[in-house]
Amino acid sequence: MGFVKVVKNKAYFKRYQVKFRRRREGKTDYYARKRLVIQDKNKYNTPKYRMIVRVTNRDIICQIAYARIEGDMIVCAAYAHKLPKYGVKVGLTNYAAAYCTGLLLARRLLNRFGMDKIYEGQVEVTGDEYNVESIDGQPGAFTCYLDAGLARTTTGNKVFGALKGAVDGGLSIPHSTKRFPGYDSESKEFNAEVHRKHIMGQNVADYMRYLMEEDEDAYKKQFSQYIKNSVTPDMMEEMYKKAHAAIRENPVYEKKPKKEVKKKRWNRPKMSLAQKKDRVAQKKASFLRAQERAAES
């Protein structure tokens, strides 16, 4: 079919329909959302859960949500900016941090539903493929589906780091190893050791060592926060191991106590009826006294 110029006449503008607001803003892929949200018709009121992963400049957001007419309902959430509590104070947007955030989300969710002792997940990090299976006589494994949003789902994307963390944490999420670091598209083989290195932050540690040898100034600029927090390349693996253990030990979100704000009054409060009557009586008495003094003088 050849090129056809769109004639923007009166009929075009009269029949024009704007796209959904979030499509206009470039925030939602409705083609993908439709397939992630619509539940099987034989499951009736059962929600279809999604694991939402969003990577920002300074944070990684992981949420478990399901769709309702009123809007998406968030069941549980975990954020990378909460990782300093577990000992990870630097590199909060790298692959290792994404894994930790996914792990925190999974353990927090299972703890909320009382399933954390039933589904421990994979405690020792190997980087290899692992799938959670339901245990007979126990509640079924919590199943959800990855929602990567508008992120480009290339091999090694941090979104899949969060996915791996959630799966190792005990959630059942359909996936394959094709998008994990360590998968070779030419040989069609997956190297679990390469994936484990990324989970343990060894790719960052190797780059730190390289910069320390090659360019000291670039190292100080690139890893200023690591230097400030005294994090060396040799400490990285142990730091993440301790973080994984700490997350499993206490994944519960602690609510901050509400600050009591003392209300300030900037205008005078209204007087009650009794106060108004009393004020009038005082003014009358004052006026009468003034009249009496004037008469005496």
Swiss-Prot record:
N6-acetyllysine carried by residues:
5, 48, 220
Residue ranges under compositional bias (Basic residues)? Answer: 258-268
Q: Name one GO molecular function term.
A: 5S rRNA binding
Main location as per UniProt: cytoplasm
List cellular component terms (GO).
cytoplasm; cytosolic large ribosomal subunit; nucleolus
InterPro entries in UniProt: Rbsml_uL18_euk, Ribosomal_uL18_C_euk
> Cross-link Glycyl lysine isopeptide (Lys-Gly) (interchain with G-Cter in SUMO1): which residues?
220
Localization terms from the record: Cytoplasm; Nucleus, Nucleolus
Q: Which residue stretches belong to region Disordered?
A: 253-297
Query: Could you tell me which residues carry Phosphoserine?
Result: 185, 272
What the entry lists under Pfam families is as follows: Ribosomal_L18_c (PF14204), Ribosomal_L5e (PF17144)
> Cross-link position, Glycyl lysine isopeptide (Lys-Gly) (interchain with G-Cter in SUMO2)?
220
Any one biological process term the GO annotation gives: translation
Phosphothreonine modification, residue list: 232
| Keyword Ribosomal protein among UniProt keywords | yes
What are the protein's UniProt keywords?
A: Acetylation, Cytoplasm, Isopeptide bond, Nucleus, Phosphoprotein, Ribonucleoprotein, Ribosomal protein, RNA-binding, rRNA-binding, Ubl conjugation
Q: Which residues in this protein are found as N-acetylglycine?
A: 2
- Indicate the family of this protein: Belongs to the universal ribosomal protein uL18 family.
Q: What does this protein do?
A: Component of the ribosome, a large ribonucleoprotein complex responsible for the synthesis of proteins in the cell. The small ribosomal subunit (SSU) binds messenger RNAs (mRNAs) and translates the encoded message by selecting cognate aminoacyl-transfer RNA (tRNA) molecules. The large subunit (LSU) contains the ribosomal catalytic site termed the peptidyl transferase center (PTC), which catalyzes the formation of peptide bonds, thereby polymerizing the amino acids delivered by tRNAs into a polypeptide chain.
- Subunit description: Component of the large ribosomal subunit (LSU). Part of the 5S RNP complex, which is a LSU subcomplex composed of the 5S RNA, RPL5 and RPL11. Component of a hexameric 5S RNP precursor complex, composed of 5S RNA, RRS1, RPF2/BXDC1, RPL5, RPL11 and HEATR3; this complex acts as a precursor for ribosome assembly. Interacts with NVL in an ATP-dependent manner. Interacts with RRP1B. Interacts with IPO5, IPO7 and KPNB1; these interactions may be involved in RPL5 nuclear import for the assembly of ribosomal subunits. Interacts with RRP1B.
Name the UniProt record assigns to this protein: Large ribosomal subunit protein uL18
Q: From what organism does this protein derive?
A: Macaca fascicularis (Crab-eating macaque)
Highest lineage ranks of the organism? Eukaryota, Metazoa, Chordata, Craniata, Vertebrata
